[in-house]
Structures are given as structure tokens and as C-alpha cells.
Amino acid sequence: MDPNLKQRIIDEAYVLFLTKGMKQTSFCDVAAAVHKSKGAVMHYFSSKRHLIDTVVKMRFFPASQLSPEMDYLEGRRWDEFLRSYKNPIERVIDSFPEKLEGNGLMYYMQFVSSANEYMDEFPQMYHELLTREQDFLFNAVVVIYKQSVDDIQVLSLIHISE
């Protein structure tokens, strides 16, 4: 038995869901992509919904998350922050396999639309992702604003003392 088969199924299903859409992707398509039988795929995933749920939770949402480095950059200079920050869509597209380069936004939109259709909890999960992102950005702006105010106060003190 292939010890990495479950992960390979998830990875190949993700690519197929991105390129073909969830509705148009069958277990046979996934099986062909991993060079196994449909039964081998069904050994790990009893239904298409189970496979979709796993792909969304193990590939899509982890790729959407902020990297730990962004916490460090939150208190840095604004230009440094802006150079490093990527929104959730950019982060997911950057995680796509090389063979999907060039049409990332189209694949992203197709995936989100399909996931919304297949997973009842997807809208809530997506909303939570965007809420966390909004909170992070708000906090980053507050920190940078406070730094700017402090810088202005220091500069005005320097100017007054001259």
C-alpha cells in the first residue's frame, strides 16, 4: 500500500477541482490522476462530499491563512508591510501548482463557487477567514498609525529645539 496515497489523492483532487470544477470531477478522474483504481480512492473517501470537504479543509483554507511572519511585520514600517502583505486570494493562488500559473484568479473563483455549492459550512468558514483578515489589517493600520503619530511628535520636537 502506498503510504502517501491519501495525500496524493487530496493534492490531485485539488488540482482537478481547480481546473475542471467540483461538479465535473469524478472519482474516476481522481483515480486516473493518482494512477489507482476508483476503489482505492473510495477506500479513503466514501463520498465526493467527503473528498471535497477534506480538500477544502486541508488545502484551500490552510493556503488562505496569514503566514506567521506577518505578525512580525504588523509593527514594522508601512512600506515594508505593504511589500510583504498578500491578501487571502493571492496567498491561495501562490500555493497553486506551477501548471496552473496564468489563470489563478479564474481557478480560484471556480473553486470558491463550487465549494460554496457543495459544502454547507463553506460560507461560514470563508466569512470567518475574511473576518480574521479584516481584524489583522485593522490592527496593523492602528499600529502603523500610532508609529506615524510618534514619528511626527519626535520630528516636531526636533524642529522646535532647533
Positions of the model-derived regions?
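Conserved small/polar residues in nucleotide/adenosyl-binding loops
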Residues: 158-162
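N-terminal intrinsically disordered/low-complexity leader segments
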Residues: 1-3
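Amphipathic alpha-helical packing segments from all-alpha helical-bundle domains
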Residues: 107, 116-146
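Hydrophobic/aromatic residues within well-ordered alpha-helical segments
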Residues: 48, 55, 59, 63, ...
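Helix-turn-helix
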Residues: 8, 16-58
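Hydrophobic alpha-helical connector segments
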Residues: 54, 68-104, 155-156
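Solvent-exposed, amphipathic alpha-helical segments
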Residues: 8, 12-19, 65-66, 108-111, ...
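Short, charged helix-capping/linker segments at alpha-helix termini
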Residues: 23-24, 147-151
